[in-house]
A protein has these predicted regions:
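Detector for small/aliphatic-rich hydrophobic stretches
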Residues: 1-158, 358-360, 404-406
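Non-catalytic, conformational "gating/processing" segments within enzyme and secreted inhibitor domains
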Residues: 55, 91-273, 282, 286-371
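A generic structural signal for residues located within well-ordered alpha-helices
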Residues: 63, 188-189, 378
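Structural recognition of the beta-strand scaffold that forms the well-ordered cores
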Residues: 67-70, 126, 259-261, 385, ...
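Short coil/turn residues that cap or connect secondary-structure elements
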Residues: 72, 76, 129, 173, ...
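C-terminal soluble interaction/assembly domains
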Residues: 346-408
């Protein structure tokens, strides 16, 4: 028996914000389909984030993980197929066909390569030469997920094959993830599936780099110095007393995507964990619909968030375990060989900066105590996510506990 390896990589680079703008709309039926799919992707992302049970930063791409597992679902059968379908919140076989078509339309609609916003979703299928991969699977993967299909020789050239995959990921993420695979693949590998999501967005109006200065960030376990960007902006905002938190939205140029930050009040860490458990897709959508513009004094870390983890144990906890079991995995719609999944590796990198990242940071004190009572100051752990505003798909979802300072 031979192993499948699943890899998901996601990167985001952004410069900081200005006034609100509004996304273009889709035809009603298409928008409804994408909203339904967006909720499914959101729920899976929440399942994974909560299942990871990490104490530090956690940043995942629900879109990337969903796309990867969706491709795998097309090649599965029996119990493995049922588990993947339930994990992706797909109700039945008929809904599965609609699911793949909706995913195809979603990727076509949200992908962008403009001067202000780039969103690139790439799927790579790397197959062992002569491994008996079923044509119908690769055909559907190309059709619905725009997958690039390549053949490699893992059996005799595992080091070179690993380098080829790393180079593909590096190019797809514009150099932000150069070495997703840190060790050569097992020579018995039959199939490697990779999904990457690269997002680079500019805010409508950037922060002034001269207003960036080092300040304290309270992690809950201690205080660290990080560069804090500041400004006064009209942003969409909501106070959430029932969750002991408040939320602000920061849109990107074009209005199709926005970053949301949910900031708990009170104790930094305990409230963050409890808060995430309350945030279903339905709850998030309801809160966003109630947000209203408000002029606020804003402070955000100039930071890098990076996260890399195996998702094998997490997916097992989410009842998607048979694909990892050589005796139980069923991928008979993918290959004529008896194969199983060895691991699912996910890496995410997010960078948050002003638009002019080469500008020198300012020196001097910064006060959030005078002149403006409307303050949204991210100086403690928060939930952060980047969302497609039309479909509701979370491109990235994270728990910010300790920002990595990103300095000029």
């Amino acid at each position: 028996m031979r192993a499948l390896v699943l890899l998901a990589a996601a990167t985001a680079c952004m410069a900081m914000p200005g006034p609100q703008s509004f996304p273009a709309s889709l035809p009603a039926s298409r928008e409804s389909d994408q909203t339904t799919l967006g909720n499914k992707i959101h729920e899976l992302g929440m399942d994974v984030s909560l299942g990871l049970q990490k104490s530090g930063n956690v940043v995942v791409s629900p879109l990337s993980i969903s796309a990867l597992l969706s491709v795998l679902m097309m090649g599965s059968a029996g119990r493995t197929h049922q588990e993947l379908r339930r994990g992706l919140h797909v109700e039945d076989a008929h809904s599965e066909n609609d699911f793949h078509h909706s995913f195809q339309r979603l990727m076509e609609d949200i992908s962008s390569d403009g001067p202000d916003v780039t969103l690139n979703i790439a799927n790579g299928l790397f197959l062992q030469r002569g491994a008996g991969i079923i044509y119908n699977f690769t055909h559907k993967a190309r059709t619905h997920y725009n997958s690039v299909v390549s053949t490699l020789d893992f059996n005799n050239s595992s080091v070179a094959s690993t380098k080829t995959i790393n180079n593909w990921v590096n190019e797809s993420t514009s150099g932000m993830i150069p070495n997703l695979l840190t060790q050569p693949l097992d020579p018995l590998t039959t199939f490697v599936a990779v999904n990457t999501v690269f997002f680079n967005g500019k805010w409508v109006t950037p922060f002034d780099p001269l207003m960036t200065t080092d300040m304290e960030f309270d992690t809950g376990a201690g205080k660290v110095q990080v560069p804090i960007m500041s400004g006064t902006f009209a942003i969409n905002y909501i106070n959430i007393p029932e969750l002991k938190a408040h939320m602000a939205a920061f849109p990107y140029k074009g209005g199709r995507q926005a970053m949301y930050i949910i900031l708990p009040r009170g104790q930094p860490i305990g409230n963050l964990e409890a808060l995430e458990q309350e945030l279903s897709a339905e709850k998030i959508n309801s809160l966003i619909a109630k947000m209203r513009p408000l002029e606020m004094r804003v402070g955000l870390p100039r930071m890098r968030l990076s996260f890399k983890s195996s998702l094998r144990d997490t997916l097992k906890k989410l009842h998607m375990g048979s694909m990892f079991n050589p005796a139980a995995a069923n991928f008979s719609r993918l290959t004529t060989l008896p194969v199983w999944v060895d691991d699912v590796v996910h890496e995410t990198v997010i960078e948050v900066t002003e638009e002019g990242t080469k500008a020198a940071a300012a020196t001097g004190a910064l006060s959030f105590r005078s002149g403006n009572s409307n303050i949204f100051f991210v100086n403690r752990p928060a939930i952060i996510f980047i969302r497609d505003e039309v479909s509701g798909v979370p491109l990235f979802w994270g728990k910010l506990v300790r920002p990595e300072p990103l300095r000029t």
